[in-house]
Each structure stands twice: as structure tokens, then as C-alpha cells.
UniProtKB/Swiss-Prot annotation:
Keywords: Cytoplasm, Metal-binding, Metal-thiolate cluster, Stress response. This is Metallothionein-like protein 2C. The keyword Glycosyltransferase does not apply. GO terms for cellular component: cytosol. Highly expressed in inflorescences. Expressed in roots and leaves. Expressed in root primordium, pericycle, phloem and in the basal parts of lateral roots. It comes from Oryza sativa subsp. japonica (Rice). The keyword Cytoplasm applies. Induction: By Fe, Zn and auxin in roots, and Cu and Mn in shoots. Down-regulated by cytokinin and cold stress in roots and shoots. Down-regulated by Cu and salt stress in roots. Sinergically down-regulated by RAC1 and sphingolipid elicitor. GO terms for molecular function: metal ion binding. GO terms for biological process: reactive oxygen species metabolic process. Down-regulation by RAC1 during pathogen infection may potentiate ROS which function as signals in resistance response. Plants silencing MT2C show abnormal plant growth and root formation. It is found in: Cytoplasm, Cytosol. The lineage of its organism: Eukaryota, Viridiplantae, Streptophyta, Embryophyta, Tracheophyta.
Length: 84
């Protein structure tokens, strides 16, 4: 769950007071933090790596795969693992 389920500024768990703008200020934070696409590719017999390779694709956050967000000190918004 990220930033109190997308409710930045709601309760002590977010560690931001009313300055965040209240509940559901960033409803898309939860959706982008939990949407991940994993692509697994097995090398051919001619490949020299001899193992599985994994690539992670993400449409947002520059490929950041973290799912825990934390509010900034100015309560201006939430940033996921400083990947914004």
C-alpha cells in the first residue's frame, strides 16, 4: 500500500498534516505504484549467459519498481523512492 492508500494528508501514517490538501489528493499514486509488467526471456541454446534474464518495464517513475511512497517534508506531494 502506498501513502495511506493514496490518501496523502489523511492521518498520522502519512506524516503530513492538512497541508497536503486532504484525502485522495493523489488517487493515481496507488495505481501507478502497483501496476508492474514483468517480461521473462530465456536465452537460446547458443547464448553464453546460461541463465534466465529478467527485464522490468514500467510506464512511469523511470522504471522504479518500489511500492512504498513517502510524503516530502513540505507536504507538497508524494514521491516514490525518490524516483520522480
Amino acid at each position: 500500500m502506498s501513502c495511506c492508500g493514496g490518501n496523502c494528508g489523511c492521518g498520522s501514517g502519512c506524516q503530513c498534516g492538512g497541508g497536503c490538501g486532504g484525502c485522495k489528493m493523489f488517487p493515481d499514486v496507488e495505481a501507478t505504484a502497483t501496476t508492474k509488467t514483468f517480461v521473462l526471456a530465456a536465452p537460446s541454446n547458443k547464448a553464453s549467459s546460461g541463465g534466465m534474464e529478467m527485464a522490468v518495464e514500467s510506464g512511469e517513475n523511470g522504471g522504479c519498481g518500489c511500492n512504498t511512497c513517502k510524503c516530502g517534508t513540505s507536504c507538497s506531494g508524494c514521491s516514490c523512492c525518490s524516483c520522480n
